[in-house]
Amino acid sequence: PMRLPSKVHGPRGLGYAELPPSDHRVTDHDSASAWVRAAHAHPGELIGVATGPLTNLALALRAEPALPTLLRRLVIMGGSYDHRGNTTAVAEWNISVDPEAAAEVLAGWGGADVVRERLPILCGLDLTRKVAMTPDHLTRLATAADSGTRPLSADDEPGTRSAAANPLIRVIEDAMRFYLEAYHDLGHGYQAHMHDPLAAAVALDPTLVATRPATVEIELTGTLTRAMTVTDWSGRREPNALIGIDVDSAAFFDRFIERVGPFARRVGGGR
């Protein structure tokens, strides 16, 4: 069954943030079909980014086994490679929600005729925990958006809403405040690891991270180790993934601010 990380990201996944109502309609097809349709429409062009459980991607792979050769690249935020988990002692959240799906996806890419450079890039906890957002980063982001704001602080009352003038910066600050508070309450400091944004950044530029080829399998039957990403670094078997092992954290935040700041300024009606 589907589980939501509400203790960290709030009941709707956006912390304290509230999005304006949308006039967009739900599509007449599901997410698995969307993967397949897009891949067929743009063969060899698209970069897939998976930042949650891999259920829909596994279903897409069942419908179209050639998906690994139809995509230009795949980046997955998930797993923990020679590192502790965040759901159990050894399992990461996204993989733990549907480990069977993760196993299918890795097996599908491993069995496909994919050159090593196009193997999935896996951004696990050992990588994403090196990229932690702080209130200073949010202040820099507001400045890049030409938005006045009040810096977030661990001394603020829980749930304090953003004072930013820019609407997008308000959404980001309200979402991040919940995340920062959750980490602070867990004893991790007033910071928040940027798991999913890092995967998106890697999709844009894989050179942001150093990778190492490996063969990854998902433990499905262990009483204590279910959903563990079992990683064989020996090189004796064909690799099915490129594991992110290091990242330039400063470069990530510079790029994040350089892209999101001006976009927020445009959304807010600025220059």
Predicted region positions:
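Glycine-rich nucleotide/cofactor/substrate-binding loop typically near the N-terminus or early
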Residues: 1-40
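A glycine- and small-aliphatic-rich helix-loop capping segment at beta-alpha/alpha-beta transitions
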Residues: 8-12, 62-69, 93-94
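Flexible, glycine/proline-enriched loop segments at strand-loop-helix junctions
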Residues: 17-26, 44-51, 86-96
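A glycine-rich beta-strand to alpha-helix segment
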Residues: 40-62, 71
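Divalent metal-coordination and catalytic microenvironments
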Residues: 52, 105, 200
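Short, conserved loop/helix-junction motifs that constitute active-site signature segments
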Residues: 65-72, 108-116
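Conformational coupling and interaction surfaces
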Residues: 96-100, 114-271
